[in-house]
Amino acid sequence: MPIKLDNKLPALDVLRSKNVFIMDENRASSQDIRPMEVLILNLMPTKEVTETQLLRLLANTPLQINVEFLYMASHKSKNTHAEHMETFYKTFDEIKDKYYDGLIVTGAPVEQMPFEEVDYWQELTRVFDWSKNHVYSTLHLCWGAQAGLYYKHEVDKVPLSEKLSGIYKQTVDMPENFLMNGFDDSFVSPHSRYTEVTLEDIKNKTDLDVVASGQEVGLSILASKDLREVYSFGHFEYDRDTLAREYRRDLEVGINPDVPANYFPGDDPSQEPKLRWNLAASTFFSNWINYAVYQETPYRLEELEDDFSFYGYL
């Protein structure tokens, strides 16, 4: 959270140069405060697990956040009871006239399919179009990031030679970016995907900043300069055992996967994995809520209706 200081304090400029968020007296006296409204578009098959993972991270912030869940009505969920969906989720038609401070678009196990062949693709593009003037900042995760880049910037995903699965080191490329506040020069997080987007495409087709990347994972975090578009290709939200469950699931269906890298002690799947990304995960989500959403979103969300300036794909 920001700290309030006297406008004339000499340390003010020094602190700002070190990426410390400062609120001067003028802004502090005029700031309106209300709960944040966040919508989660949950595309994962294990919806209740993903709900818990994301809510745990959002709950670490000191802000009051009202959360709603959205699902794609054009897709029938096979892994979640209909009663759960009817009770806790809303369709796009039910929320399309509302406004939100933040939207989280999760990953989905469909990345080896062309985007247009995903059964809910048309509905998803409606959500992307709607979000232009109904959401302040959108956080896209894994396949959700690839889908957003494809639709908004015409950046397609590229197949990897083998699945990227494990805990990987990444480097902070833009320490001055508020999303990286509180991060060390490097951090680790889970990745689990068969595809990637290339730096060449990002440079040629977008004006997004590369916030973090890694030698093994490639691009990790991208963001627009105003943080209204944020793309994360990893899985900060994963629990300690998520990669283990994915590994055993793949074994059961005969995929014969590699053991997730840098995950099990001694690469022994019988051992309990070490949890090494929890602090980075909490910091990233807190930074997104605070700097990309809370500090910049209008008090009256209806004002988003007239603001199209932040989307480079318009």
Curated annotation (Swiss-Prot):
Signal peptide: none
InterPro entries the record matches: Class_I_gatase-like, HST_MetA, MetA_family
Keywords: Acyltransferase, Amino-acid biosynthesis, Cytoplasm, Methionine biosynthesis, Transferase
Cellular location(s): Cytoplasm
GO CC annotation terms, alphabetical: cytoplasm
Gene Ontology MF terms: homoserine O-acetyltransferase activity; homoserine O-succinyltransferase activity
CDD domains xref list: GATase1_HTS
Enzyme class: transferase
Descriptive protein name: Homoserine O-acetyltransferase
High-level lineage: Bacteria, Bacillati, Bacillota, Bacilli, Lactobacillales
Gene: metAA
